[in-house]
């Protein structure tokens, strides 16, 4: 056995003994009448205490005689004979508690409190005071154990160093990393800000099916399930788009949905199979109207969250009060690729050779539009740091977008990029039923065998289009990526409480 194996074996043995010791303590507690208290009436949090009383001096706190009731997890303890200091951690921070046997009785202190462990959940009632070093603390009058931690917490100095364990055991990550709470609090605030903005702009929030007969609205591999009662294969939705446009056909004019989508595809720092998206549609408008709305939405979110429009993400400064840059896909490729010309992008043989020269595997059924999009994704996308709308996407890669009036080979479509990430996608919606029918069929015909399994001809949507879809613009925003940028996190797993992981294997 190597030294590392010996050390690991020794660590496991120590952990096993510690767990058994704690389990026996719980057995003893139950014999003494512990029955898992049903509640504890707390009246404050650690953060509120600091916010309100940190500026008070020792004498002021004595004269005020402020009694507080607080609950949380004991994460540190320093026993000094007949008195102890311990740290209580709640969701908003930590606060120091002072306890001595004179205040709570000698027997309780010696035979109960001193036998409790780090990680135990406690309820504390006491008065505020400041120590000689000026630390705001609570002088404990009464302390109750609310639940026993049967396993020791991660090392307080190193926390959880294994990334996968952090994601798999998020509860431990939250206990050992106080900063994590602020990320997910901001996530909630961002979603609130989006909803507030949409409602203030006269949008109605709607809900469309998660279980669908045909997974439409995007080209992605779906999750497949089965409905026993109706004896039918069904799919978790990959996008709500086609249902939302049916509502526009039905007479709704300004709608949005903020919910989950599911795509049975890769997991990475940028992708999670289960993700949150906001889609919005405005009748009697075009993609330029939607770009303007998108800019205003981002201004509103950052102002709500930070009281300012300036943020930092991945060491880059952003100012969302400034107009977003607008660039066509063709112009963006020319800007970042000095060896190709505008005429080359229109010549099938030249654009194909250029794509091959930069490592793109060109498929036989691809036209210029698909190849141009692949070049853009490989050479441009990650270089778009400041907020940029890329417009004029080829028809070939935009089956649901309206053709441009001047150039029928491109669409009135945009994608928003920030920090090298695609954050949003929007366009003037295609409402020509014959064109839509043809594009659906062409998409299936040109796809490879693997993609073909994921493409469906949606007869119900074509039927709905026959009743007339008014001029409409649509928008989709990836909420998880947006939250990454606004909270300065470089992995999507750090903004999802329980990201998708492979099954644990011992």
UniProtKB/Swiss-Prot annotation:
Mg(2+) 2 binds at residue 422. Homodimer. One of its GO terms (biological process) is lysyl-tRNA aminoacylation. GO terms for molecular function: ATP binding; lysine-tRNA ligase activity; magnesium ion binding; tRNA binding. Its cofactor is Mg(2+). It is an enzyme of class 6 (ligase). Gene3D superfamilies: Bira Bifunctional Protein, Domain 2, Nucleic acid-binding proteins. It holds the Pfam family tRNA-synt_2. NCBIfam families: lysS_bact, PRK00484.1. Belongs to the class-II aminoacyl-tRNA synthetase family. Its EC number is 6.1.1.6. This is Lysine--tRNA ligase. It catalyses: tRNA(Lys) + L-lysine + ATP = L-lysyl-tRNA(Lys) + AMP + diphosphate. Binds 3 Mg(2+) ions per subunit. It is found in: Cytoplasm. Coiled coil: none annotated. CDD domains: LysRS_core, LysRS_N. The gene is lysS. Mg(2+) 1 binds at residues 415, 422. Keywords: Aminoacyl-tRNA synthetase, ATP-binding, Cytoplasm, Ligase, Magnesium, Metal-binding, Nucleotide-binding, Protein biosynthesis. One of its GO terms (cellular component) is cytosol.
């Amino acid at each position: 056995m190597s030294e590392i194996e010996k050390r690991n074996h020794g660590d496991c043995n120590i952990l096993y003994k510690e767990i058994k010791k704690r389990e026996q303590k719980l057995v003893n507690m139950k014999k003494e009448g512990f029955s898992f208290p049903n509640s504890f009436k707390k009246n404050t949090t650690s953060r509120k205490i600091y916010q309100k009383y940190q500026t008070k001096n020792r004498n002021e706190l004595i004269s005020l005689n402020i009694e507080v009731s607080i609950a949380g997890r004991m994460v540190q303890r320093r026993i000094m004979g007949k008195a102890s200091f311990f740290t209580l951690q709640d969701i908003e921070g930590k606060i120091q508690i002072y306890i001595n046997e004179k205040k709570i009785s000698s027997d309780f202190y010696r035979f109960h409190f001193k036998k409790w462990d780090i990680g135990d959940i406690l309820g504390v009632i006491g008065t505020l005071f400041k120590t000689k070093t000026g630390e705001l603390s609570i002088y404990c009058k009464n302390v109750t154990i609310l639940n026993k931690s049967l396993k020791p917490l991660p090392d307080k100095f190193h926390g959880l160093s294994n990334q996968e364990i952090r994601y798999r055991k998020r509860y431990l990550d939250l206990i050992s990393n106080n900063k994590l709470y602020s990320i997910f609090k901001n996530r909630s605030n961002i979603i609130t800000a989006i909803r507030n903005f949409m409602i203030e702009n006269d949008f109605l929030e709607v809900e469309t099916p998660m279980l669908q007969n045909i997974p439409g609205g995007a080209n992605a591999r779906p999750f497949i399930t089965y409905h026993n009662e109706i004896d039918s294969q069904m799919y978790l939705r990959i996008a709500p788009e086609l249902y939302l446009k049916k509502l526009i056909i039905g007479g709704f004019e300004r709608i949005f949905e903020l919910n989950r989508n599911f795509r049975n595809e890769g997991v990475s720092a940028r992708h999670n199979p289960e993700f949150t998206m906001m889609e919005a549609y405005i009748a009697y408008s075009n993609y330029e109207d939607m770009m303007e709305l998108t800019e205003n939405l981002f201004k509103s979110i950052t102002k709500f969250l930070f009281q300012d429009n300036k943020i930092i993400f991945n060491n880059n400064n952003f100012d969302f009060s400034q107009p977003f840059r607008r660039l066509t896909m063709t112009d963006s490729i020319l800007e970042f690729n000095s060896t190709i010309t505008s005429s080359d992008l229109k010549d099938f043989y030249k654009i194909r050779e250029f794509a091959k020269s930069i490592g793109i595997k060109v498929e036989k059924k691809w036209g210029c539009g698909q190849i141009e999009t692949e070049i853009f994704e490989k050479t441009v996308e990650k270089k778009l740091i400041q907020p940029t709308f890329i417009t004029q996407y080829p028809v070939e890669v935009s089956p649901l977008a309206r053709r441009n009036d001047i150039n029928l080979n491109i669409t009135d479509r945009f994608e928003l990029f920030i920090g090298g990430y695609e954050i949003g996608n929007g366009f003037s919606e295609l409402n020509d039923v014959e064109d839509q029918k043809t594009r659906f069929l062409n998409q299936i015909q040109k796809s490879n065998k693997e993609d073909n399994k994921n493409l469906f001809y949606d007869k119900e949507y074509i039927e709905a289009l026959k009743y007339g879809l008014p001029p409409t613009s649509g928008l989709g925003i990836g909420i998880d990526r947006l939250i990454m940028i606004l909270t300065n996190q470089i992995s999507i797993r750090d903004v999802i409480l329980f990201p998708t992981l492979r099954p644990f294997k011992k």
